[in-house]
């Protein structure tokens, strides 16, 4: 890990630990989980939010006011809004995506859950997602939360990352394996 990334992840971990402990002490982990999901989605979808957090053009006060307005508009809990305001005042909003991921991991650990990253060729139906989660739960022995993305280049099938293991049942991977087998024969 490079030094700047290490520093960023260290900063994010400190904010994540603090907001997690505050929410846990107040019994507000469900609200914090909802806030982190909303912030993660907002970060992915909003170039303006990413610019606000990462651009050196904005002064501390501007960042602080803007993030407070964003928190109010999103209806975030007081603990989350105060944490974001503090991060804005310290010019630490650039670590927001790492902090969100860290908090989500802490909440999942607290709940005895693990997250499986699922990439599918087409969106999963609710019943397919439920069956996949049940199958992964049987394998992992813990509740599994699915984080799904769609990648049409897979043609069909799934790629599932669960902890340190990866299961690739995609047509794309099977075609690549056949191509390699044909190269060895011919």
Swiss-Prot record:
Coiled coil: none annotated. F-type ATPases have 2 components, F(1) - the catalytic core - and F(0) - the membrane proton channel. F(1) has five subunits: alpha(3), beta(3), gamma(1), delta(1), epsilon(1). CF(0) has four main subunits: a(1), b(1), b'(1) and c(10-14). The alpha and beta chains form an alternating ring which encloses part of the gamma chain. F(1) is attached to F(0) by a central stalk formed by the gamma and epsilon chains, while a peripheral stalk is formed by the delta, b and b' chains. This is ATP synthase subunit delta. SUPFAM superfamilies: N-terminal domain of the delta subunit of the F1F0-ATP synthase. Belongs to the ATPase delta chain family. It comes from Cereibacter sphaeroides (strain ATCC 17023 / DSM 158 / JCM 6121 / CCUG 31486 / LMG 2827 / NBRC 12203 / NCIMB 8253 / ATH 2.4.1.). Keywords: ATP synthesis, Cell inner membrane, Cell membrane, CF(1), Hydrogen ion transport, Ion transport, Membrane, Transport. Pfam families: OSCP. It is found in: Cell inner membrane. F(1)F(0) ATP synthase produces ATP from ADP in the presence of a proton or sodium gradient. F-type ATPases consist of two structural domains, F(1) containing the extramembraneous catalytic core and F(0) containing the membrane proton channel, linked together by a central stalk and a peripheral stalk. During catalysis, ATP synthesis in the catalytic domain of F(1) is coupled via a rotary mechanism of the central stalk subunits to proton translocation. This protein is part of the stalk that links CF(0) to CF(1). It either transmits conformational changes from CF(0) to CF(1) or is implicated in proton conduction. It comes from the Bacteria. GO terms for cellular component: plasma membrane; proton-transporting ATP synthase complex. It is a peripheral membrane protein. InterPro entries: ATP_synth_OSCP/delta_N_sf, ATPase_OSCP/d_CS, ATPase_OSCP/dsu. NCBIfam families: ATP_synt_delta (TIGR01145), PRK05758.3-2 (NF004406). GO terms for molecular function: proton-transporting ATP synthase activity, rotational mechanism.
